[in-house]
Design a protein with these regions (language model features):
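Extracytoplasmic copper-binding redox domains, predominantly the cupredoxin/blue-copper superfamily
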Residues: 341-478
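Positively charged n-region of N-terminal signal peptides that target proteins for export
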Residues: 1-4
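C-terminal region of N-terminal signal peptides and the immediate post-cleavage residues
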Residues: 15-24, 478
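Beta-strand-centric surfaces of beta-sandwich/beta-rich domains
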Residues: 24-215, 220-340
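A broad, structure-centric signal for solvent-exposed, well-ordered loop/edge residues
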Residues: 7-8, 281, 390, 411
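Bacterial N-terminal signal peptides
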Residues: 7-17
């Protein structure tokens, strides 16, 4: 009896101490970080590179999930038609590892994979926060990390992944391309496949040659409005296989025209065995039937486990290509625009003065013909057929970029994430008038532009792609 009682007492003691032991050896930690505060200047659309104390886990382990966001210092997530997270890229030891665009894709790796983390790693943050309004603001870049510390029992079975950055304009700090309305085939345009001479005389920039056998574990695409999907393709000798199509899911009532979107990522069972010498490539497909899409992107970061065995033979037919949405609809994306506003229809306005000198853009206003100015200042300036109308951006001295981009008349409705669009009956776009470091800026590195000289008689509406509340018009006469 005494022995039985002793055994029972020891059993009860072990049950009592078990929760404490589990708490001392956590499995997955959910950590929240923020970088900033960042002061956002009026109309800002510049790229910054910061290596100053980017927060990260303080102990070694594995990062298995990453969820980015943008929040105001005073609290709350800003609307996307007010402040737009164009991109944030977390570079670790010089390599792009985690990233965010305005679709705010959330990454979660299947077990037992993770990014190896050492507190001594060098973290640098490349970020571009786009202010669509002429106001100052202050924000934090936030990111929630799912983390397996080395003290966790899960750490013993973890397998290390690396991010392989596949980009249709790989190697560029601002990797963009233009999609012109009517380009491609059947209202769709795929870059670089349908771009004439996409890379000039240089090598293809959308490819990566596998240097070591291993397993692909996860991927998801990054697109801009108008984007439909990205494709990840493997080539082995003379054989090709589409490994995954990352589709864009739009909640936007107007269709594929806004940031009211989420991307499909690979499913939890997606694994692809790759061999040294395999070539992976990425392409991006956009809707080219409705509007033009300037400064578009197509990126697919891939989590790759080198030296790991397993995964499906890409040519076996056993690859699970079903995707999963990384998140649902976000409330900051619900101001769509397009409602009737108080701006005039420029087609009904009397002629403005003849344009003999460049029209100055200053303080977020176009010179003559700005619809927000009212009165005589809103009347479209007149230029004779065959003659250009010139613009100069006086705000460029304050690092504020503006465009003159054709939109469908009257182009006078309320601004939102889906309005206005670059859908004028005649296409023209100035690029972002302003200056910045070559290759590291959205700016065109000029502050002047002139309209095409082949425009027919009529009234032409335009807006600023950087600050879409800005609207203007001009008139061509014989």
């Amino acid at each position: 009896m005494r022995r039985a009682a002793l055994v029972l007492a020891l059993a009860l003691l072990s049950l009592a101490t078990a929760p404490g032991a589990a708490a001392a050896a956590p499995k997955v930690q959910h950590l929240s970080y923020r970088y900033g505060p960042l002061t956002i200047t009026p109309g800002q659309n510049t790229i910054s590179l910061d290596g100053d104390k980017v927060p990260r886990p303080k102990v070694p382990g594995y990062i298995v999930g990453f969820r980015p966001n943008l929040v105001r210092v005073k609290g709350g997530v800003p609307r996307v038609d007010v402040l737009h997270l164009h991109h944030a890229v977390w570079l670790i030891n010089g390599q792009p590892t985690f990233a965010a665009g305005e679709e705010k894709t959330q990454v979660s790796l299947p077990r037992p994979y993770g990014w190896r983390h050492d507190p001594a790693d060098a973290w640098v943050l490349n970020h571009m926060v786009h202010n669509l309004l002429p106001n100052r603001d202050r924000v934090y870049l936030t990111y929630d990390i799912d983390f397996v510390p080395d003290s966790s029992p899960l750490a013993r079975g973890m397998r290390t992944v690396q991010t392989r950055w596949l980009d249709v304009e790989g190697g560029s700090a601002y990797p963009v391309f233009d999609v012109h309305r009517g380009s491609g085939r059947g209202g769709r345009f795929t870059y670089p496949d349908q771009a004439p001479n996409a890379y000039g005389d240089g090598p293809a920039r959308n490819r990566w040659v596998v240097q070591r056998d291993g397993v692909l574990v996860q991927t998801a695409g990054h697109l801009h409005p108008g984007g439909l999907y990205t494709d990840l393709v493997l080539q082995r000798g003379g054989r090709r296989k589409n490994l995954f199509r990352s589709r864009a899911k739009y909640w936007e009532p107007a269709g594929a025209v806004s940031w009211d979107v989420a991307m499909y990522a690979t499913g939890r069972k997606w694994r692809v065995a790759v061999k040294k010498g395999d070539v992976l490539s990425v392409s991006a497909t956009y809707d080219s039937g409705r509007a033009s899409w300037y400064e578009s992107m197509g990126i697919m970061p891939v989590a790759f486990a080198p030296g790991v065995k397993g995964g499906a033979d890409p040519f076996s037919g056993k690859l699970d290509r079903r995707g999963r949405l990384t998140h649902g609809q976000l409330p900051e994306n619900r101001n769509h625009g397009g409602e009737r506003g108080g701006l005039p229809d420029p087609r009904a306005l009397p002629d403005g003065p003849g344009a003999s000198a460049p029209l100055a853009i200053s303080d977020f206003l176009y010179g003559q013909g700005d619809l927000l100015r009212g009165g005589a200042a809103s009347r479209p300036p007149v230029v004779r057929a065959g003659q250009p109308l010139s613009f100069v951006n006086r705000d460029a001295s304050r690092d504020i970029f503006h465009t003159i981009t054709a939109c469908r008349a009257p182009c006078n409705r309320q601004t939102g994430i889906a309005y206005p669009l670059a859908d004028g009956p005649v296409e023209f776009d100035s690029g972002e008038l302003g200056f910045g470091p070559a290759g590291f800026t959205a700016a065109a590195n000029r502050d002047t532009w002139a309209t095409p000289t082949n425009l027919k008689a009529g009234t032409y509406s335009y807006f600023c792609r950087v600050h879409p509340f800005m609207r203007g018009a001009f008139r061509v006469k014989q």
